[in-house]
C-alpha cells in the first residue's frame, strides 16, 4: 500500500523518517487491537524465488518463521543493544530482512539501513556511525577492500558480520577477520534458502576461525538437517554430494497459490 524510500524522495512515496513520524500518530490502543488479531502462523512476507532455474514462486513466510530465525541468527552473532549494524544488503531479500533487520530487532541492536550498496557510502557509514557489524556477499567485501577510502576507514568498533549469499573464499573471510584489516574478528557464515526463512546452519562467534572460514557451521537449535541422494531419498555418507534437506520452525508455509509445488517441497 505504501512505498518507503531511504535517503531520497520520490513522488507518491514516504521517506523512512516520514514513515516513522506517522507511526507515532497511531494510538497505542489501535496498535494493541491490531496486534491481538495477528497469529504466529500468519504470513508476514512473501519472497519470490526461482533458485537458479524455473518459474518464480512466491515463498510465504510467517511471523513464526521470520522471528525465530532472526533470533537464532542474532544469538550466533552475539548481538546486543551495544551493536550498530549497517544494513547494505537489500531489505526485499531475506539477507536484509531476516539475517540483518530481524536479528537486530530481536536483540535490541541499532539498525543503520543504506539506500543502496556503494563501497564509498558503506565505508563512510562505518566511520560516521561507529558500526560494529555488517553483512554482505563476497563481492561487496571485495569492492570495499579495493576502494580508495578503505585505508582511511576506522574499523576499530567492528567485531562481527555475515559473509554469505554465494561461495565465500576462506582467504577473503580471513582477511576481513584480521585486526589490521576490517577487524571483523568474529566473522561468520550462514547456509540456507528462501524456503527456510532463510537460515538453517550457521557458525557462531567464538567458534575457531578455521571452522568459521571453511564451513557454513551447524544446524540452528530445533532444526533438523540431512543430505540425501535425490534419486533414492536415502541419506548419503559424509563427503558425498547430495541434496540438502531441513525441517523445523523455519520451514515456509508454502508457495503462493501453488499447492502441487508446495506438496512436493514441504
Question: Where are each of the predicted segments found?
Answer:
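Gly/Ser/Thr-rich phosphate-binding loop
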Residues: 20-21, 131-136, 145-211, 224
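Conserved AMP-binding/adenylation subdomain of ANL enzymes
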Residues: 67-84, 92-133, 143, 147-148
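Conserved beta-loop-beta connector loops within the AMP-binding
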Residues: 226-245
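Conserved ANL (AMP-binding/adenylate-forming) active-site segment centered on the GW(Y/F)…HTG consensus within
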Residues: 209, 251-266
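Conserved pre-ATP/AMP-binding loop-to-beta segment of ANL
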Residues: 5-11, 17, 22-48, 55, ...
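Conserved S/T- and glycine-rich ATP-binding loop of Class I adenylate-forming
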Residues: 43, 49-52, 85, 91, ...
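Short beta-strand->loop structural element characteristic of the AMP-binding/adenylate-forming
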Residues: 57-60, 87-88, 109-116, 188
Amino acid at each position: 500500500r505504501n512505498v518507503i524510500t531511504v535517503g531520497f524522495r520520490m513522488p507518491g512515496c514516504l521517506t523512512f523518517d516520514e514513515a516513522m513520524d506517522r507511526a507515532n500518530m497511531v494510538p497505542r490502543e489501535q496498535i494493541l487491537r491490531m496486534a491481538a488479531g495477528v497469529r504466529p502462523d500468519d504470513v508476514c512476507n512473501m519472497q519470490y524465488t526461482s533458485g537458479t532455474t524455473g518459474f518464480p514462486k512466491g515463498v510465504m513466510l510467517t511471523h513464526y518463521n521470520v522471528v525465530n530465525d532472526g533470533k537464532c541468527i542474532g544469538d550466533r552473532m552475539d548481538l546486543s543493544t551495544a551493536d550498530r549494524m549497517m544494513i547494505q544488503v537489500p531489505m526485499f531479500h531475506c539477507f536484509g530482512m531476516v539475517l540483518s533487520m530481524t536479528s537486530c530487532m530481536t536483540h535490541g541492536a541499532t539498525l543503520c539501513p543504506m539506500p543502496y550498496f556503494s563501497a564509498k557510502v558503506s565505508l563512510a557509514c562505518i566511520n560516521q556511525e561507529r558500526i560494529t557489524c555488517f553483512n554482505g556477499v563476497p563481492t561487496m567485501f571485495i569492492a570495499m577492500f579495493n576502494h580508495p577510502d578503505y585505508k582511511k576507514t576506522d574499523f576499530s568498533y567492528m567485531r562481527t558480520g555475515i559473509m554469505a549469499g554465494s561461495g565465500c573464499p576462506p582467504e577473503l573471510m580471513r582477511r576481513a577477520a584480521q585486526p589490521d584489516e576490517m577487524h571483523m574478528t568474529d566473522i561468520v557464515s550462514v547456509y540456507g534458502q528462501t524456503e527456510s526463512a532463510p537460515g538453517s546452519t550457521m557458525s557462531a562467534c567464538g567458534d575457531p576461525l578455521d571452522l568459521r572460514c571453511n564451513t557454513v557451521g551447524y544446524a540452528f537449535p530445533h532444526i533438523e538437517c540431512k543430505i540425501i541422494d535425490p534419486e533414492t531419498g536415502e541419506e548419503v555418507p559424509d563427503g558425498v554430494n547430495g541434496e540438502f534437506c531441513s525441517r523445523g520452525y523455519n520451514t515456509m508455509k508454502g508457495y503462493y497459490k501453488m499447492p502441487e509445488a508446495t506438496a512436493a517441497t514441504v
